[in-house]
From Swiss-Prot:
Signal peptide: none annotated. CDD domains: ERI-1_3'hExo_like. Binds 2 magnesium ions per subunit. It holds the Pfam family RNase_T. It comes from Bacillus subtilis (strain 168). This is Probable 3'-5' exonuclease KapD. The gene is kapD.
Length: 205
């Protein structure tokens, strides 16, 4: 039996203090939040800090913006163990990967290349922020928590905490999918639905 497996993913990354500080900077994943859903049921959530390799020392801007400490990241899991966990969450390699924006998968691919580790996912990749923009006809992409507010809801937990953002994205995903179904063109009625055959037969007799 085919199952509908979703991984709703949010990462937080290292940030530079300025354009050239540190030199040759590229973002690395330092926090991950994942919601795994099978057939519309949440079966697992995952949250962890991840130790960056190339730029292990967090910048002041990064710590201030993400409300994260150097100690939390230093005690996080190794990138190799993190990828192992991603593989465990998608053993059949058929999960649909859902993110808010395209940066999460871009950074994951770049980090995998830097660490000489194969990219862990093979399923469909869906950018929910782009789907939201197209669905509502917005000209620009909307932030995750602003989109939640536009739906008359509030985000889950704390913004820029990876698991809280993943849970918020999952809530939004379900709301958008629900609205898409409402707007789908209904199937044309059959002749039996258009005509009450019982009444027709009564009149004939």
């Amino acid at each position: 039996m085919t199952t509908n497996s979703l991984l709703i993913i949010d990462f937080e990354f290292t940030m530079p203090d300025g354009k050239y500080s540190p030199q040759n900077f590229f973002p690395e994943i330092i926090e991950a939040g994942i919601v795994k859903s099978i057939d519309d049921e949440v079966v697992e959530t995952f949250s962890s800090y991840v130790r960056p390799k190339k730029f292990p020392k967090l910048t002041k801007r990064c710590k201030s913006f993400l409300k994260i400490t150097q100690k939390q990241v230093d005690e996080g899991m190794r990138f190799e163990d993190f990828i192992r966990k991603l593989n465990e969450l998608d053993p059949e390699k058929n999960s649909t990967i859902i993110t808010w924006g395209n940066m999460d998968m871009k950074v994951l691919k770049q980090n995998c290349m830097f660490n000489h580790i194969p990219f862990p996912f093979k399923g469909e990749m869906r950018d929910l922020s782009l789907e939201y923009k197209n669905f509502f006809g917005d000209r620009t992409l909307t932030g995750l928590w602003k989109a939640a507010e536009e739906y008359g809801d509030s985000g889950t937990g704390t913004h820029h905490k990876a698991l809280d953002d993943a849970l918020t994205a999952y809530k939004l995903f379900k709301l958008v999918e629900q609205d898409k179904q409402y707007l789908e063109k209904p199937k044309p009625p059959t002749i039996g639905e258009r005509i009450d055959l019982t009444e027709l037969l009564k009149r004939a007799t």
